[in-house]
Each structure stands twice: as C-alpha cells, then as structure tokens.
C-alpha cells in the first residue's frame, strides 16, 4: 500500500509538471515572482538580526537593518496581489485547456456505452466538479506547484542561515526535521485523497439526494407529495454513509502519524536549540549570530504545517485531472469501427440503408434488445417504425447514429458497411431528435442553429426551419424573439412548455436538413403534442420532407399512417411491414393496435 501511494504521488507530481507548458510563458514570470517572495522573509530575518545586533552594540548601522526588514515587509505586501493575479491567470488557462479535453473526450471520442458505466460516471462527476470548484481544479494544482517555490526557497534559506551560524551538522538536523514533518503532512493528505477517490460512488449518491432535494426542478412534486421529511432523512443517511468512513479514516491517518513525526520534529528542534545554547554559552556567537540562529531555526520548523496556497490545490486538483485522464483512456478504448478518423466520409444514401441480421445488447445486460433484425430504409422515402414501449425503437436509432455498434450483424449504406465510414462525417449526414433531446439554456436562435453550427449565419434557413417545425408562433410570443434565453433562471429568460420545446427541437433538426443532412430521424418527435396537433404535424411534415430519407419513431399508430412504409417492431424483431392500407387489410398486430388506440382517442 505504501509503495503504491509513493508511486501514485510521484505520478501526480509528474502530471502537474507536464501541465506547466499549457499556461504559457506566464509560468516563468510566476516562478520568478515566487522565488523573490520566498527570499523576502529571509531578508526580514537578516534585517531584524542586524538591527538587534546594532542596538546591543554601538547603535551604528541600525537603520540599515531596519530598512532591510521594512523593505522586505513592504515588498511582500506589494507583490502578494501580483502573486494572486498570476495564480488566477495560470489556473484559468490550464482549466480552460482541461475543460476542452474533457469535452472532446466525452462528446466526440469516448464510446457512449462506456460513458454510461458507473465507474466512468464517478470519474465524470469528479472531473466536472473539479473544474468548477476553485481549490480543486487542475489549474489550481499547477498554480499551487508554482507557489511551493516560495516555501522551498524559505526552507533552503533557513537551512543555509542555520548552517552559517551553527555549522553543517545543525543544518542537516534541522533539514531532516523539516522534511520529516513535510512528508508526514503530505503523506497523510495523499492517503486521505486516495480514500476519497475510492468513495466516489457513495459521494455521487449523497450529492444526488442533496441536489434533488434542494433543486427547483423537484420542488413542486416534493411540496405536493409532502416528501420533504423523507428527503431530509435520506440526505442524512447517505451523507453519513459517505462521510463517516472518511472521518474514521482521517482520524486513523492523522493521529498516530502526526504524533510520530511531531516527536521527530521536536527532537530535532531541541537538538539544534541545545547547539545554539552551547555555542552562545561558549561565547562563540555574537548577538547577531544568536538572533539570526533563533529566527533561522524557526523557518524550517514551520515547514510541517498545512500550506493553504498549495496543498489542497495540488492534492484535490490532481484528482480532478486524473479523472479527465481516465475518461481520455476510455475514449482510447473505442471499438475498431469507431477508430476511423481517416475513413471515407459518410455518403448521401442513393439506394438506401440496410440493417442486416443486427442484434444488440447493452453492456452489462444479457438480454438482446434487437435480435437478428433485417430492415430496409429505401433512400428518398419515409419509414415509420412503430411499436409498444420497450420494443427497441430508440435503440435502433442509436445504432443508425453510430452511437453504439451492433453486437452482431451489420448496418450498410448502399451496400457498404457503416463501420467503414468516419463516424463524425456520417453523423453530420443525420438530423436526429431523440426522446430526451437537450433543452439548452441559451437563446432561441442558438437552440435552433445548434443543429448545424457551421451554418449559423444563414438566417433564411433558420427562419425556414422554424416555420417548417411550426415554431414561428412560439418565437412570436417571446419578449425578445430569437434573442430570448429559454430559461427563467436568467434575467429576461422564459420557460417553454413541453410542446413548445418539442417544436424548437424539431426546428433544430430541420435546420440541419437545411444545412445538408440527408437522413432525418425523429424519435417520438411529437410525444408532448395532443393527438390532433400530432396528426397535423405529421401530415405537413411528410409533405415538406418528401424525397428525403426519413425515419419516424412513434408509439401512436394513428399519426404515421401517411408514411410511405410502416414497420412494426416487437420484442426486438420486425413482425409486420407495409403501407397503412396493407397492414390494415392484413388484420394483424398493427391493425389491432391501431383500432385500439383510435377508440381511446375517439
């Protein structure tokens, strides 16, 4: 265990050092500034010692000592704001670079199935939290490392002054005492940090309960159901489950080791003080030497304390950075089909897309969601995929989007396996709205043009997409039109209803079509619209997108009757397919469910 901690500690320091170039040349200036700040306390010690010596003597030269001490104090006061400014600048630059790395790994590189696994969810929680908590960011770790320069310069200066007054033996003893104290303090911090990282799952549970119980999103339901006492009890229980083991471990880690290294430091300090007393008793020391020796000894003895400008920053900040590295490692474990950055661009389907004996099961689950599925999506036609909840409809969309790879079988475009194409370029060929589409807390315009950010300057395409989606009325009601932020959490912002949000999300997908996407996939696009509005939307939508390869997922059979072809999915397999008229004439599952739903909405 001890060897593992030592190895982990060395690796952490190396990782911090490798981040130094990210901040740029400002690190050199900050290092020089901390070097100077580290020398200033030594100047104060020398200045006061000279002043005391002159007072005890003739008094001549006293002002030189006083002047050196005063200048040292003033420079510390003057330079401290600059030190803080450089610390902030370095932290921001490094954190910005780390945030970009985290976003790249999670949003473009890491497999979705890997990101959904509990160990990586814990890592992502630590990384995100670390990037927003000032004292725990990777940038703070880099700035904290530079701040340690001042501390070690003070230590070196104190040791040198001790050696000049009492000789090399005293210098070695005081150095050993200081380093024992320092390594004892840092070792305890490292062991505690390791234990905290191992409790990530318990921490995630505790934070979830606390966040949910204190959030506005859950406030209405908590009040109406009167569940606040339960949330309080659950928060106490989960917090105790997370914190109590850490408190016990902290006492175990801190108490005995602190006692041990404190005794070592005390012994070293007593030994050096005895040397100082003996030298003074023999008359070997002047007043200058005695004053200098007393103050110089105290500098290393203060080295075993907690350094507020560096210790938690380097320890906790590196935990966040190590979480980012873990996510990047997961991103490097992509399946062979996803490692094709140099592969051909995704084509515009000419003949169509085919699912060939495709099976799929989510990682960690034994049951296949799709089982040897064969499906043709002819180019330029609209295909509706219907089925009850849990039939595998959304999973099919995820496979088509290359967010997941089939467990067995393959998906092809015009006869070429989808795995042969570059994933990103293929995804740009698709305009997709998922069931759980994102409600961006941005202005309305951004919520639409994020469907194709490269075309954000095309205002005409933006307006067409809004009109096609039936969102023009929504925009007209907003106080600032397209410039209105779609969240009441911001001044002047507005919350939208579920149906209004759905129209905005549809506009986003249709804007991607305007920008060149050739396959449009809508997963339950109108689930929050009433039946009449849904039918009207589909009638208009299928008319506007005629000639485009369109896939519409729905559990309402009555709303997709105008699609060129309807596919019924049940238990991960296709049970029926054909036009609405053909399926009704067949009198099978589709016809039965269509009539059942029609009676419910009659």
What are these regions (language model features)?
Residues 1-14, 92-139, 202-211, 215-245, ...:
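Extended non-transmembrane interhelical loops and adjacent amphipathic helices
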Residues 1-41, 64, 122-157, 241-244, ...:
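Membrane-integrated ABC transporters
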Residues 21-25, 128-141, 223-267, 313-316, ...:
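An intracellular "coupling" helix at the cytosolic face of ABC transporter transmembrane type-1 domains
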Residues 25-82, 152, 156, 163-189, ...:
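Transmembrane helix-loop-helix hairpins at lipid-water interfaces of multipass membrane proteins
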Residues 293-330:
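Cytosolic ends of transmembrane helices, especially the final helix of ABC transmembrane type-1 domains
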Residues 410-412, 445-491, 547, 585:
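ABC ATPase nucleotide-binding domain helical subdomain, centered on the C-loop/LSGGQ "ABC signature"
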Residues 472-504, 508-525, 529, 600:
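ABC-fold ATPase nucleotide-binding domain signature/coupling loops
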Residues 539, 547, 555-602:
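C-terminal portion of ABC ATPase nucleotide-binding domains
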